[in-house]
């Protein structure tokens, strides 16, 4: 399973800022915490659209950058695309978490999958104490159309992800303009980590994953997840790759990997 995490904005395309916090800085931190938590689950590979403050596709518009980020994630085999953002409002009273999902006008299953994923993540965020806002889709306001003639989504994340056949969602974690959200979650590492872990937990529930555990006996180490254990396969655990033999024991030292060659 490949999960694409997209820290929204960057140093070129800055996001919202208020109360001493900046969106493009914090979205990267939240995504990094989410990545670390997701990698505690066996069989999950995380693709990050950016790992520094820099724009991954400089020299163009924000829409071009987003389109390329999604294309890169799809090329990496991503099954879902989760874009991390923070909200802002003219009203300092506005607070809480909301998530934007694909519409169901074209490739409706993508929209349905996006709603399922968003519902699970929103539930985890609300469980932290964030105010529950809405999960919604937004259609184009300039009559743009998908291939089937239906109205397209408004945001590039949803449009590009849908074109690649994967659900793209925008998670607006909290408001930079609300002092309660900022003090509880955004101006401290503990709060940012809670947000990232909540995102990861929702994603894991979407895929039906459970955390595994290492065990050791007289023969060696093995890794169990739920009622089953890994065997005869490679697995990425906590960001590192391991190979488990036919009996489920972790191999050590150099291993010979046979690669098939074919023509096309």
Where are these regions (language model features)?
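Short glycine-rich His-centered loop
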Residues: 1-20
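Hydrophobic "anchor" residues on beta-strands that sit immediately upstream
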Residues: 2-4, 168, 244
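Pocket-edge structural micro-motifs
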Residues: 7, 101-103, 173, 225-226, ...
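Acidic glycine-/aspartate-rich tracts in secreted/extracellular proteins
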Residues: 11, 176, 247-249
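A short alpha-helix capping/helix-coil boundary motif
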Residues: 13-14, 49, 257
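Active-site-proximal helix/loop segments of hydrolytic enzymes
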Residues: 21, 25-210
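Extracellular adhesion/carbohydrate-binding repeat motifs centered on closely spaced tryptophans
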Residues: 209-264
